[in-house]
Curated annotation (Swiss-Prot):
Protein name in UniProt: Large ribosomal subunit protein bL19c
Main location class: plastid
Superkingdom as given in the UniProt entry: Eukaryota
Family the entry assigns: Belongs to the bacterial ribosomal protein bL19 family.
Gene encoding the protein: rpl19
UniProt KW keywords: Chloroplast, Plastid, Ribonucleoprotein, Ribosomal protein
GO MF annotations, alphabetized: structural constituent of ribosome
Compartments it resides in: Plastid, Chloroplast
PANTHER family hit by this protein: LARGE RIBOSOMAL SUBUNIT PROTEIN BL19M, RIBOSOMAL PROTEIN L19
Matching Pfam families: Ribosomal_L19
Amino acid sequence: MKSNKNLIQLVESNHSNKTLPQLQVGDTVRLGVSITEGNKERIQATEGVIISKSNCGINLTITIRRVLQGIGIERVYLLHSPKLKSIEILRKSKIRRAKLYYLRTRSGKATRLQQRFN
C-alpha cells in the first residue's frame, strides 16, 4: 500500500504545478476561467462565495454560489485545471460550518456572512 501512495503522490506532484492561495469555505473569490469560442480564447471572470470544498490533492474542487437576477447559480471548479487562469480572494468570512448548503434556502440579507479581518 505504501508504494501505491508514493506513486500517487509522485504523479500528482508532476501535474500540480499551480501555487494556490489559501482558500476556505466562506471566502468570496473571483475566478478567471478560460473559455474558447470558435477559434478565440478569452478569460471570463466569475465571482461568488465558496460553499464547499471536496477531495484533496490534484482532485481538489470548490463549489461557488452566486445569485444573479434572483436566481441562484452554483458551479463546481477543479482547482488544478488548466482552464482556471486566476484566483483572487476578495473577502474572508467568519463561519463555523464545513459546508454552507444552508445558504441555498436563504434570500436577501440573510445570505450575508460576517467578515473576518485577520
